[in-house]
Amino acid sequence: MSTATGVRAGRRFTVGRSEDATHPDTIRAAISEFIATAIFVFAAEGSVLSLGKMYHDHSTISTAGGLVAVALAHALGLAVAVAVAVNVSGGHVNPAVTFGALVGGRVSLVRAVLYWAAQLLGAVAATLLLRLATGGARPPGFALASGVGDGHAVLLEAVMTFGFVYAYYATVVDPKRGHLGTIAPLAVGFLLGANVLAGGPFDGAGMNPARVFGPALVGWRWRHHWVYWLGPFLGAGLAGLVYEYLLIPPADAVPHTHQPLAPEDY
């Protein structure tokens, strides 16, 4: 089921129509994702560069104080990014969230592809602006800690992203979310920050392929990059399927009327 504005019921994978790509609502949603992702990545990656500038060593993020500072920047940055985009695009701000919504039938493939393009471009634009504004500072990006293998990192990314997308579904997508939708940006932001505290020392806690892609491209750091795509997509896809098919009753699969801070068009 869909409407002219792109509101979709879940539980049915849909490719979408070619004209959907040029629909004004789709274009507005893609622009929203571009800007929101840029806001988030600028704050998140900027916090890492800031610590490196203060202490002349990016390894300071491995200290307790540095880790808390970076986690806080991620949490606040994402909360704001989701808040400013959720009523326009659903506030995905993350290709993995879009993938979870895709497998759950909440967005068409056409819209998902446009979201992915907008998110990646937003991340690259934010990282380029950071490099220009900081006098050419090379973004540190993401890397695996000593002793952490590719398989460990994929599992860690999958688990963290599963929880993140599950929280997104519960606070943004679930038709019975009620007033819980008003705290959706804070809920997902806090969980992101908590996961950075939990996973940061091991693999940087990506959970967002766009967040990883921007610094990787601008800083040209590609080692283990595939880990930060495979893990989040596995976790997000599983979260979308679990919440959509096990926790949302069939009768509630059709989106209800608009509520504050909950998207009418995602």
Curated annotation (Swiss-Prot):
Keywords: Membrane, Repeat, Transmembrane, Transmembrane helix, Transport, Vacuole. It holds the Pfam family MIP. It is found in: Vacuole membrane. CDD domains: MIP. A motif (NPA 2) lies at residues 208-210. The keyword Transmembrane applies. The chain crosses the membrane at residues 29-49, 66-86, 109-129, 153-173, 180-200, 228-248. GO terms for molecular function: water channel activity. The keyword Cell inner membrane does not apply. It is a multi-pass membrane protein. Aquaporins contain two tandem repeats each containing three membrane-spanning domains and a pore-forming loop with the signature motif Asn-Pro-Ala (NPA). Belongs to the MIP/aquaporin (TC 1.A.8) family. TIP (TC 1.A.8.10) subfamily. Aquaporins facilitate the transport of water and small neutral solutes across cell membranes. This is Aquaporin TIP3-2. It comes from Zea mays. The gene is TIP3-2.
